[in-house]
Each structure stands twice: as structure tokens, then as C-alpha cells.
Amino acid sequence: MVSLAVPSTVVRVPREKATVVMAVDVSLSMQATDIEPDRFRAMQTAAKEFVDVLPERINLGLVSFAGTATTLVPPTTDRLQVSNAIDNLDLAESTAIGEAIFTSLTAVENFQSTVETRGEEPPPARIVLLSDGTNTVGRENTQAIDAARAAGVPVSTIAFGTDYGTLDLEGEIVPVPVDRASLEKIADETGGSYSEAVSAAELEQVYADLGSQIGYTDEPKDVSAWFVRSGLAVALLGVVLSLLWTNRLV
């Protein structure tokens, strides 16, 4: 018995629900000017564009990290609240990437608990972490990776900056290259995606791509009805042409 395949195509549709926590590095190395106007301000601009491209039904939270990590905005659909928090970010010493992941996971878990108390199923969650440096304080990245895997939350990472970034600390020029390897490892081992950006424009594109990946999903769509309508139209056209040709012969 031969079965006929149903004609279909793939369409991109906004996700009904999802939870995203954006974790951003605000360590002093983000003052480096290898990215114009500097890493910090370029990050702020690109992060706000990421906020704008996410579908409105996605809950978005914001975590900042330097020597410690802080949840500035719990997951919410209030985009203005997140954008305002990005505008008000401040720089500080040290880089606690591991703590940023743990804090982001806590934000996700708290939000999921709230959803469950309403009798609803928690939506899928993801962390999007941007950094330019190496973990220097707090819990190790390996511990954070284990926690993210246990929670089933992928961590997508963005390595931002060049190998030639420097920082002027009281007259001393200090190199601040990007630690790509550790950020790539976090993404690989948690099931997230890894991206690099060495300019403001590249960072904006990375965030735009992530927004598209996270905010939308590809779904098959049955187009058999279109084929049926098209087939009927062709058949009717054939009948009309046949009648016209017959009339010419008579």
C-alpha cells in the first residue's frame, strides 16, 4: 500500500512562553576601548536591542555581575523595567561568572515556583551570559555548569572584546584579553550556544540572532489545502480551454 505524503512547509512562529535571564558583565575590564565607544556602553546598547526583539510573551530577567552577582530584574514581560535597569548599570571590581550563573538559576527557579503556584506548567528557560574575562572570584565555572545541567537550563554565552583590550589603572596599562575558552566550555557543556563579538555591530547581530532563536520556533504547516485549491484551479482552466478548443473545431 502506497501512502501519499501530506504537503507541508515550515513557518517561524513566536513562542507562546519562555523564560530568559540575561546576565551581563559589569567588571572594570568592560571599560576597555578596543570596542567603540567602549565595551560597557556598546554592551548596554546591544542589550537594550535584545530586549526589544524578544516577543512580548517571553519573560525576561536581568542579572549583573562583577565581584558578586545581583538579580536586578526578576523575569517579567515589562520590557521598560529591564531597559531602565540596563541604563543604570554600574561597573565594579572582579568577575564572578560562576556566581552569575547560580544567581540566574535562582531567578529562574523562583519564577518557575510562582508559575507552579498558579497551577501552570513552567515554560522552558535559558540564560544568556555576556562576559569579557575570566572567573576570578566566587564559585568555579565547573560548579555552575553542573548546577545548570541539573536544572536543565542551557547557558548561551557571548565572548565580547578583542585580544588587544587594555585598561588604564592609575597609570598602569593592564591587558584585558577575552577568555573565550572558558565561555565556550560553559555553552558546550550546558547545551547552550557560543558566540563571539569583536565590535559593537557584531554584538548587536549576536543578540539579534539569539533573540530570533529563543523567541521563535519553526513549526510545520499543512499546505495541502493550498495544493487542492491550486489543483482545482488548474483543472477548471483545463476544462475551459478544452471547451474553447472544441468550439473552434465545430
Across the structure, where does each feature detected by a protein language model lie?
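…and closely analogous acidic/polar surface helices at protein-protein or active-site interfaces
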Residues: 10-20, 30-59, 74-79
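VWA/integrin I-like adhesion module and closely mimicked acidic/polar interface patches used
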Residues: 99-102, 114-126, 130-189, 207
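Short beta-strand-loop
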Residues: 14, 58-91, 102-118, 167-183, ...
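C-terminal signal-anchor/stop-transfer transmembrane helix together with its immediate cytosolic
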Residues: 1-14, 212-250
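Sec-exported extracytoplasmic/periplasmic mature domains
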Residues: 28, 48-59, 87-91, 105-113, ...
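Second-shell loop/turn segments in exported
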Residues: 28-37, 68-72, 86-94, 131-135, ...
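Juxtamembrane amphipathic/hinge helix adjacent to a transmembrane helix
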Residues: 19, 192-224
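Residues that scaffold, gate, or flank divalent-cation-dependent active/transport sites
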Residues: 25
